[in-house]
Amino acid sequence: MLLLMVGAHALEEAGTDVAATAEIPEGRTIGERFQALTRSTRWQKVREVRFTFRTHHPQGLSLVGHRFFLSSVEVADRAQGRGTGHLFEVDADGNLRRQIRLGEGPMYHPGGIDYDGRWLWVPVAEYRPDSRSVVYRVDPESLAVARVFEFPDHLGALVCDRAGRRLVGVSWGSRRFYRWELLPDEAVPRTPQAPVQTLNTSHYVDYQDGQGLPGTSWALFGGVSRLAAAGGPEVALGGLELVDLGELRAVHQVPVPLWTSRGQSLLQNPVAVQATEVGLRFSFLPEDDESVLYVYEVR
């Protein structure tokens, strides 16, 4: 059963009256500027924002206007498949504005989310690989929820290909890509149970979150890879990858050598990106429960 915490928003069936989305040139700007970044890029911290509520385990982050939407999982008993999926609306100062709960039975683990200009797309899966998921659309204004489809695998993140009218998901650990064609006049997949499927040939990081770049068939994914020398401590190295959603392959990869004071990679959890006047701005939310948004810029 889907639980809602805001007002009396009813669970809607995926509808057919979908407003057209205006393409935004920012997407191509982000993609082109990202491809100019290298391992020598200098990252400048410009702001920290402490979230004023318990965030649990953050999963996905999307910027809608001046608001952040954050998906998160609250685990009660992982072995028994019990927990709660959350979607939080947060203002620019880190204050909680509204929240809803998403999930059905053992499917309580939200993944990385994306905003297509009209809807937020949120996958909620069982907390284990090779399991199953349910995909929701959420209206960011009303927080009304539409259950779109179920899928027989763990979907760790979803991104929107606005240029190609496609939805792309990744499996647990992002080892597989799934791609669905959306119907011309509806924000629903043409064949929910039969997507294009291919292995992810990039093994640099496991994606935690992703963001489709408007006006393009690119998406930016962020994640971590855990490395350790024999007998030495484990280090989580964060990285960002630009993925061509038409070819389902990474076209540019950049390490992000940034950590919190406690040694966590800034890409441990979700990330969001924006274009600035001359560069790019990245917002990272790596910590659980008592989270701080770390904002960095590059040029």
Protein language model regions, located:
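Loop/turn-rich, solvent-exposed surfaces of beta-rich toroidal or solenoidal domains
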Residues: 203-247
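Structural motif
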Residues: 79-86, 130-136, 175-181, 228-242, ...
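A short beta-strand motif characteristic of beta-propeller blades
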Residues: 45-51, 96-103, 144-149, 192-200, ...
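Short loop/turn segments that connect beta-strands within beta-propeller blades
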Residues: 91-94, 139-143, 182-185, 245-247
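Repeated scaffold domains used in trafficking and secretory/extracellular systems
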Residues: 55-60, 105-112, 153-161, 202-212, ...
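A short helix->beta-strand "capping" segment at the edge of beta-propeller domains
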Residues: 30-54
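Blade-loop segments of beta-propeller domains
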Residues: 85, 94-117, 121
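Beta-strand-rich domains and repeat architectures in extracellular enzymes and scaffolds
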Residues: 49-79, 83
